[in-house]
């Protein structure tokens, strides 16, 4: 019995993501799964695409984006899909769209406007953000970081030109735990920016430790990328 597939992409240079050299061949797709890689000439399909020698590869992961809001506003994500990107990591540089509710009593510190204005920060929890994403799924996968600057701005009510108090750190740690339990992959910081510049290492470490208990990672935009680069890393 002849093997069947929905889509065949043939006459391609196949890069399979294992580190192996590209090889001539193709892939077969059935439903939402790749069901064969390599010689697909004997497989029948309702739709066959001649790649004309172009590369067929796994989707790319864009590991540094600020796509938090774009994922909701433009779920087709043509800006990524047309580049071969199928997964984005957002919430970088200490700025995430959630968990954060702004106040009319204080201004959002720099660089919070990177993701939008006060009206666009409308998710009091990461869980609320995740539900909005699930309601209108984007065309790409998303791995989300919880932003230290976002946490600081809310916990300190915009008064970010100082270290956080023990109580404020405890509030941020609680938010990190809630965010990790709702599906985030870790915490990010943007220590070069006004919102995070005055945070001592101990404050950042406290949040990274909270994420680490869930297997989360820590990503940073360093305090300095020039003369004090080595000091920033240390």
Model-derived features with residue positions:
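Histidine-rich, glycine-flanked metal-binding segment
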Residues: 1-8, 14-59
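Divalent metal-coordination and catalytic microenvironments
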Residues: 12, 27, 32, 53, ...
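Active-site environment of divalent metal-dependent phosphoester hydrolases
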Residues: 68-71, 95-98, 152, 193-196, ...
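Divalent-metal coordination cores built from histidine and acidic residues
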Residues: 73-185
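Histidine/acidic residue-rich metal-binding segments in metalloenzymes
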Residues: 128-129, 163-189, 195-234
